[in-house]
Regions:
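Detector for C-terminal structural segments
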Residues: 29, 297-324, 363-372, 394-506
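N-terminal lobe/hinge region of extracytoplasmic solute-binding protein
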Residues: 38-86, 119, 184
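Aromatic- and charge-enriched surface segment that lines or borders ligand/interaction sites
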Residues: 82-125, 141, 147, 283-284
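Surface-exposed binding/hinge segments that line
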Residues: 85, 89, 96, 130-172
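Alpha-helical secondary-structure segments
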Residues: 110-117, 143-149, 188, 218-220, ...
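Gly/Pro-rich hinge or "lid" segments in bacterial periplasmic/extracellular proteins
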Residues: 162-215, 220
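Ligand-site clamp/hinge motif
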Residues: 209-253, 381
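Structural transition elements
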Residues: 280, 312-346, 364
Length: 506
C-alpha cells in the first residue's frame, strides 16, 4: 500500500493506496472486478437538480458526467466540455463540447442537452440551484458550442459545473419526468436495478462504449449506505466494503486492525446559529448572545479529546487554503466562560436561555453532548433535536431549528461556500438572514478579481466571525480508512474523492 503527500499552496493533496475487498472476501491486487464503497448516507433522488452536496457525489458520478472536473488540488480542467472561456467582463462563458458522447438511452450529448440540463438546474432545490441563478440564458451556438449569459460574474461557476450543476442527464429522460427514480446519464456506469436495494446497496455495471473508460477501471461499483459510523467500520473490517469516511476516534483502532489511515484537511464542524434575526429564538437575535456561545466553547480541549488532535481549532467556515482565510481570526473567541456569562447578562439573559439545536444522528451524536455541556456551563440549555438522516422530512427538521450542528464541506473557490450558506436563498440559510455588509460584499466580490477580490473575501470572513453568524469548533482532518488492495488519490476541498481516482493497487 502506497502513501504519498504532495504539497500545494497551503494544503496537501494526499495520494494514497487504500484498502479493498469485494462482497464478502478479500480482493487481490490488480483486481478490477469490483469496487465497494461505504457511504455516509442514502440517496434521496437521482435528479441532479435536487441533489444536495456532500456524500452523494459517488452516486452521481457513477451515472452522470460533469461538464468540467476537478483535479486533486481542486483546479478545474475539461471533461465533457473540452474548452471553456469567459469574455472580458466575465458575464459570458463559452463551452466547447465533445462530439463523441451519448447518454445511456442512446440520446446524443450536444449543446441542446446542455441547455436543457442547465435550465432544469435553475428550477431545482438542490445544491446546484444557487449557482444556477446567475445563468440568465443558455445560448446554443451550434451542436458543440454553448454560451452561458450571466446576470453578473460568478467566481464559483466553474467549480459548480464540475459537480452538481454540471452533471448531464439525458434530456429525453428529463422530459419524461422519471429522472428522480431512474438515472439516465452519459457516465461510466449503469444502475443495475436487479442488484440494487434502496438503503442497503446500489450496484452499478460498467457501461459499454463509454468514452473515458480508462479513467474508471472497475467492472462493477457497489455503494453501501451507512448512517452510523460504527456499522460502517464493522463493514470495512469484515470485508463488506473497501473504503470509508471515518472519524478521528477510529484512528488508533484502525491502525491496530491493520487498516490504512489517511487524512486530508477538510470540513468544519460546529453550530450554524441561523436564527440571527431572533424569529424563533429571540436570544440569537442579539450578537452578544452569539458571541457568548462562541466564548463558551473550549475548542482546544474538544480538538484534543474528540478529534484526537486531527485538525485545527477554528472560528471560520472557509477552507484554510481559500482566499477568504484569515489565520488571526481563530484567536477571536478564546475559551472564556466568564466572558460568555458577562455577554449573556449584558444581552438581558443573566439566567441563560433555552436553545433548540438539531443535529444529524450518527454523524454528530458524539459531539453534541460535549457542546451541550459547555453551553450549559454558561447558562444555555440545549434542547436536542436529533434527525435520523435527511429522508422523510429529516432535512427540513434539521434546517427548521434556530441552530443546528452538522459537518460542512469547505470549498475552493470560497464562493461555493458563499452560495451554500450566506445568501438569503442558500440551502443552509433556512431563515434567509442577511445584513447590509454581507449584501454589499456579495455584490462586490464577483465583480472583483485577484488581490482586490481576496481582500473582499477576507473582509466578509472577518464580518461573519465578528458578528458570530456561526460557532465553528474545528476545521478537522477528514479521516479515510481502507485496506491495501486499491489505490485512491484524495482530493483537496472535496468530502469524497471522485470515482475516477479509485484504481486497483499495482
Amino acid at each position: 500500500m502506497k502513501l504519498n503527500r504532495t504539497l500545494t499552496a497551503a494544503l496537501a493533496a494526499v495520494a494514497l493506496a487504500l484498502a479493498g475487498c469485494s462482497g464478502g472476501g478479500e480482493a487481490a491486487e490488480g483486481d478490477t472486478s469490483q469496487l465497494v464503497l461505504g457511504n455516509n448516507g442514502d440517496l434521496l433522488t437521482w435528479d441532479p437538480a435536487e441533489m444536495k452536496e456532500g456524500a452523494v457525489i459517488h452516486y452521481a458520478e457513477a451515472v452522470y458526467d460533469p461538464l468540467l472536473r476537478k483535479t486533486p488540488e481542486s483546479k478545474i480542467e475539461p471533461n465533457l466540455a473540452t474548452e471553456y472561456q469567459y469574455n472580458d467582463d466575465l458575464t459570458e462563458l463559452t463551452l466547447k463540447l465533445r462530439d463523441d458522447v451519448t447518454f445511456s438511452d442512446e440520446t446524443t450529448f450536444d449543446a441542446e442537452a446542455v441547455r436543457v440540463n442547465l435550465e432544469a438546474r435553475k428550477k431545482g432545490a438542490g445544491s446546484a440551484s444557487e449557482a444556477a441563478r446567475v445563468i440568465e440564458r443558455v445560448e446554443v451556438v451550434d451542436k458543440t458550442t454553448v454560451k452561458l449569459h450571466l446576470s453578473e460574474p460568478s467566481p464559483g461557476l466553474l467549480a459548480a459545473l464540475a459537480t452538481y450543476l454540471g452533471y448531464m442527464a439525458s434530456p429525453k429522460a428529463l422530459a419524461a419526468g422519471g429522472i428522480a427514480t431512474t438515472p439516465v446519464g452519459s457516465g461510466p456506469y449503469l444502475l443495475d436495478p436487479g442488484n440494487t436495494e434502496k438503503g442497503v446497496r446500489y450496484t452499478f455495471t460498467s457501461r459499454e462504449g463509454y468514452w473515458n473508460r480508462d479513467a474508471f477501471p472497475f467492472e462493477t461499483v457497489v455503494i453501501r449506505p451507512y448512517e452510523e459510523f460504527t456499522a460502517r467500520y464493522n463493514a470495512l473490517t469484515t470485508g463488506q466494503i473497501q473504503f470509508m469516511y471515518g472519524t478521528p476516534d477510529m484512528v488508533p483502532k484502525a491502525k491496530a486492525d491493520g487498516l490504512t489511515v489517511a487524512t486530508v484537511p477538510g470540513e468544519w464542524q460546529g453550530i450554524i446559529l441561523q436564527d440571527r434575526a431572533g424569529k424563533a429564538s429571540p436570544a440569537l437575535g442579539d450578537v452578544r448572545v452569539r458571541q457568548a456561545i462562541n466564548h463558551a466553547l473550549d475548542r482546544k480541549a474538544i480538538l484534543d479529546t474528540h478529534y484526537g488532535g486531527l485538525g485545527q481549532v477554528s472560528t471560520q467556515t472557509f477552507n484554510p487554503a481559500s482566499e477568504a482565510w484569515v489565520p488571526s481570526l481563530n484567536e477571536r473567541y478564546p475559551y472564556d466562560p466568564a466572558k460568555a456569562k458577562e455577554l449573556l447578562t449584558a444581552a438581558g439573559y443573566p439566567n441563560g436561555f433555552k436553545l433548540k439545536v438539531s443535529f444529524s444522528e450518527g454523524f454528530m451524536s458524539p459531539l453534541v453532548p460535549i457542546v451541550a455541556q459547555y453551553l450549559a456551563d454558561v447558562g444555555v440549555t440545549v434542547e436536542q433535536v436529533p434527525v435520523n438522516g435527511f429522508a422523510n422530512g429529516g432535512l427540513e427538521t434539521l434546517k427548521g431549528q434556530p441552530a443546528f450542528m452538522l459537518s460542512f464541506s469547505t470549498n475552493i473557490p470560497a464562493w461555493t461556500d458563499v452560495l451554500n450558506k450566506l445568501t438569503p436563498t442558500s440551502l443552509w440559510n433556512n431563515f434567509q438572514y442577511t445584513d447590509d455588509t454581507v449584501t454589499r460584499l456579495l455584490r462586490e466580490i464577483p465583480a472583483a478579481q485577484g488581490d482586490q477580490q481576496a481582500a473582499l473575501y477576507k473582509e466578509l470572513n472577518t464580518h461573519l466571525v465578528e458578528h458570530a453568524w456561526f460557532a465553528p469548533i474545528v476545521t478537522q482532518e477528514n479521516v479515510y480508512l481502507a485496506k491495501p488492495e486499491i489505490d485512491v488519490t484524495m482530493q483537496q476541498a472535496q468530502l469524497m474523492p471522485s470515482l475516477r481516482f479509485f484504481a486497483p493497487a499495482k
